Amino acid sequence: MTLQQQIIEELRVQPTINAQEEIRKSIDFLKEYAKHYSFVKGFVLGISGGQDSTLTGKLAQLAVDELNKEVGEMKYSFWAIRLPYGVQADEQDCQDAIDYIKPTGSYTVNIKDAVDASVKALANAGVELNDFVKGNEKARERMKVQYSIAAMNGGVVLGTDHAAEAITGFYTKFGDGGADLMPIFRLNKRQGKQLLAELNCPEHLYTKVPTADLEENRPSLPDEVALGVSYDQIDDYLEGKEIPEEPRQLLEGYYLRSQHKRHMPITIFDVFWK
């Protein structure tokens, strides 16, 4: 088995999909989990205004709508969480995503004061964070807030990790990578677009240039620039196609270096890293 085949198998990517079937799989997954655990009253997700959170949020709300219809009461909810750091450049996209998803409820928590306080406390202790690490601080603060809201509402936290993100490790460990359920795991980037198109999402929410927007020295830095490889190349690789040698080596290097992100904390019994 080649490394490419191993990665595809691990991330459960299919070369082609039926969008309606994948939508149904994700909705049923969320419903089954909620029904299995009596303490679950709904789902929580941070909404950034990008493709991945818009898709995951819409799937969650559809699952909640079906659950409530089945039980004949408003037992379940989906809470969409806005988590800007100060003023967000693409705030209108965030509002458009909320309008499209139509969540049961929403909260807005500006994380700037909390992040800045943490950065200041570390500086006072003699630890000066660089811009990249401060970006990770933002991602972890956002996830911390989501878990607090989930705890107070009987919710579980959803993540937006998908195959094109998982292969590169392009997320913050214990930040956006730290969630309870990952409804779109198995899909690559273009397949996520297919689902949103099927769900009649406003096109600009899934055709915009993807960016994590965590770094202040490089605001709105496109993912593809940060990674040095295009999502089309990543998706082609995940679908089993041949891609040029340079991006292939880059992707496989990312995958091998980020294995720790796809595992629980490592114990003496783990050997994958050796």
From Swiss-Prot:
Role according to the record: Catalyzes the ATP-dependent amidation of deamido-NAD to form NAD. Uses ammonia as a nitrogen source.
GO terms (BP aspect): NAD biosynthetic process
Binding site for deamido-NAD(+): R140, K173, D180, H260, K261
GO molecular function: ATP binding; glutaminase activity; metal ion binding; NAD+ synthase (glutamine-hydrolyzing) activity; NAD+ synthase activity
Top class in the EC scheme: ligase
Keywords attached to this entry: ATP-binding, Ligase, Magnesium, Metal-binding, NAD, Nucleotide-binding
Subunit note: Homodimer.
Enzyme Commission code: 6.3.1.5
A GO CC term assigned to this protein in UniProt: cytoplasm
Pathway note: Cofactor biosynthesis; NAD(+) biosynthesis; NAD(+) from deamido-NAD(+) (ammonia route): step 1/1
Catalytic activity: deamido-NAD(+) + NH4(+) + ATP = AMP + diphosphate + NAD(+) + H(+)
Keyword Transmembrane: no
Family: Belongs to the NAD synthetase family.
Pfam families: NAD_synthase (PF02540)
Chain sites annotated for binding ATP: G46, I47, S48, G49, G50, Q51, D52, S53, T160, K189, T211
Gene3D superfamilies registered for this protein in UniProt: HUPs
Binding site for Mg(2+): D52, E165
Name this protein carries in UniProt: NH(3)-dependent NAD(+) synthetase
